[in-house]
């Protein structure tokens, strides 16, 4: 959501909530005690994590999957006290505003409201793992990393219970957690270790079109952050390091060091990042990870949605997914020459893309 959509009170609350990681964790501890019995009765089974580089269709896929009542996910309603959703829901109830859709800051036609799914869990990872967010980059979570912080493992699992509990009521009885978080590409291995029955869904796009979209959004958010300082502050606090002044790419296999100085205002930066990301994910593909071609979703959406329903192991709601078939539309195409892409790196990208297509569930 754009920074101009926040009142003075909204900004003050945001700054209070993010003034100290300890404040939110202390409130979460209070919440644990207040709702202990109800939280303890909730099981976390078969969570679904939708993740990839941004601009790959993660938002649309999560909205579609999230339309099925068995899922619970983060929404803007949990802001700014992300770590204590039950407590904040109770406190903010009398002041809750009507949910009205508006185009998100990306300017891509996607609508958001207070009830839209968003990647707020990244702020929790950031609070517990600050050493992974190192200067201008993010360091991936490797095998065994999850066990290094049993405190976080317990906190995070408990947090998922809270969200599931929060979404219950009326005709909704969600039993599973749904995550949309591009930052999770840095920790797919850890997520499998933490949730052996979890499902990781990774959409991908043609590298040229994807790189063009990434470059466009980086320039878009660079301008937004320059124009609206609170927008930069807000996105930094919630862990959105995808674009603009807050950019922190994931340093898969040390690609940032191997590439040398590369300007993120150039297409080659994003092409190298694309290659590093998907080579890493293919090499470290876990048993519970599925790749999904976004272009094929647009070409045959009903077939794709049927495959997605099987991948995420829906208990019910398959017909609900199919009602969203007309939302999949071919994205804007880009030209490699106009983007000034290195032909050697581009050949490598096309080879990686061919492997992804072979692995795609559609």
What are the functions of these language-model segments?
Residues 51-52, 180:
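The Walker A (P-loop) glycine that initiates the GxxxxGKT/S ATP-binding motif of P-loop NTPases
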Residues 59-72:
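A conserved segment at the C-terminal end of the G1
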Residues 45-47:
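Pre-Walker A (Motif I) flank of P-loop NTPase domains
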Residues 180-182, 191-216:
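Conserved phosphate-donor/acceptor-positioning beta-strand/loop module used by diverse small-molecule
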Residues 1-42, 215, 219-362:
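PAPS-dependent sulfotransferases, especially Golgi type II membrane carbohydrate sulfotransferases
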Residues 77-177, 245-251:
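PAPS-dependent sulfation machinery
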Residues 176-180, 291-293:
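Short catalytic-loop micro-motif centered on adjacent basic/acidic residues
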Residues 55:
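Walker A (P-loop) phosphate-binding loop of P-loop NTPases
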């Amino acid at each position: 959501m754009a920074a101009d959509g926040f009142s003075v009170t909204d900004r003050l609350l945001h700054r209070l909530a993010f003034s100290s990681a300890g404040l939110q964790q202390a409130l979460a501890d209070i919440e644990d005690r207040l709702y202990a019995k109800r939280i303890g009765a909730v099981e976390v089974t078969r969570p679904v994590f939708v993740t990839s580089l941004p601009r790959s269709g993660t938002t649309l896929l999560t909205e579609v999957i999230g339309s099925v009542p068995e899922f619970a996910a983060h929404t803007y309603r949990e802001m700014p006290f992300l770590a204590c959703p039950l407590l904040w829901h109770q406190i903010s109830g009398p002041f809750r505003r009507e949910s009205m859709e508006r185009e998100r800051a990306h300017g891509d036609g996607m609508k958001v409201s207070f009830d839209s799914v968003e990647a707020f869990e990244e702020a929790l990872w950031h609070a517990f793992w600050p050493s992974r967010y190192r200067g201008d980059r993010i360091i991936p979570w490797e095998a065994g990393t999850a066990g290094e912080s049993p405190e976080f493992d317990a906190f995070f699992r408990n947090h998922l219970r809270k969200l599931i509990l929060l979404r219950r009521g009326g005709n909704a009885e969600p039993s599973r957690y749904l995550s949309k978080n591009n930052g999770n590409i840095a920790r797919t291995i850890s997520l499998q270790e933490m949730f052996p029955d979890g499902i990781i869904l990774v959409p991908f796009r043609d590298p040229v079109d994807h790189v063009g979209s990434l470059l466009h959004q980086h320039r878009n958010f660079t301008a937004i952050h320059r124009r609206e300082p609170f927008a930069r502050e807000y996105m930094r606090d919630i862990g959105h390091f995808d674009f603009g002044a807050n950019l922190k790419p994931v340093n898969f296999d040390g690609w940032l060091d191997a590439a040398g100085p590369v300007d993120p205002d150039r297409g080659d930066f994003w092409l190298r990042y694309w290659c590093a990301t998907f080579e890493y994910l293919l090499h470290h593909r876990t048993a519970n990870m599925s790749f999904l071609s976004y272009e094929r979703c647009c070409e045959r959406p009903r077939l794709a949605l049927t495959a997605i329903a099987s991948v995420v192991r829906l208990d019910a709601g398959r017909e609900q997914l199919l009602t969203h078939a007309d939302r999949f539309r071919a994205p804007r195409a880009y030209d490699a020459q106009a983007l000034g892409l290195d032909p050697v790196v581009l050949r490598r990208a096309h080879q990686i893309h061919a492997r992804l297509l072979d692995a795609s569930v559609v």
